[in-house]
From Swiss-Prot:
NCBIfam families assigned: bioH (TIGR01738)
Domain of life: Bacteria
Gene designation per UniProt: bioH
Binding positions (substrate): 29, 87-88, 150-154, 241
Protein name: Pimeloyl-[acyl-carrier protein] methyl ester esterase
GO annotation, biological process: biotin biosynthetic process
Amino acid sequence: MNATTPAHRPQLHIDTRGQGPDLVMLHGWGVNSAVFTPLHEQLSEYRVHYVDLPGFGLSQPIAGDLSTWVDALIHALPANAIWAGWSLGGLVATQAAIRYPSHIQGLITIASSPCFMAREEEAWPGIPPQVLSMFGEQLGQNLPKTIERFLAIQAMGSETAKDDIKQLRDLVLARPLPDAAALTQGLDMLNQIDLRPQLSAIQQPWLRIWGRLDGLVPKRVQPQMPTANHITDVMLAKASHAPFVSHMEEFLQAITPWLAQFKD
């Protein structure tokens, strides 16, 4: 479906498939919801809403910050859904769970961090500032090449990196390239957003999936995250930043039993 909203709220492209509890899937920076195509059949027991984030894929850009994006998504998606976000999408889903707890029944973050930027003064592991700066500078020069480089970094470390990059690229390029302003918005979010002080507000069941070989969200993030009875961590030993591509079977083994709690 395409979520049509009042004229002042731009259109979001949402591809809804399957039957069952509502599950929202949010992609990462530089790509679109087509990256989740391999999961369509595997998640058919859920009513899955594959969302193109604002300015990505077939969605129109939405000016503003992370909160603006979250507000637009909340208005376009069913209440009482499970929200799953990969990378930047995980940041969006986390903010949504914090701001709209009654709308979100459960949270899944995949290779995602509440604070993507490395903070040396706090010994917080993350992306070195110069890496995000480099991508920001390259955006104005060669958009397709910049996205391809980013895809390569996401697969780095995986034993099947070459195949992973090709699969990601083929899926992503089936839709229009992202809007340049949306890419800058996304980089700013990765650069500036720090949700760590607000994580205690998340009381919904929360599944966090990590890749031990992830070059963007280092494995050292996980031990520094809050723990509680409603939180489950799964570290995939041989996965990098795109575990649902490189290790789909292990990824599904992590999410399938966890999702089952919402079927009753």
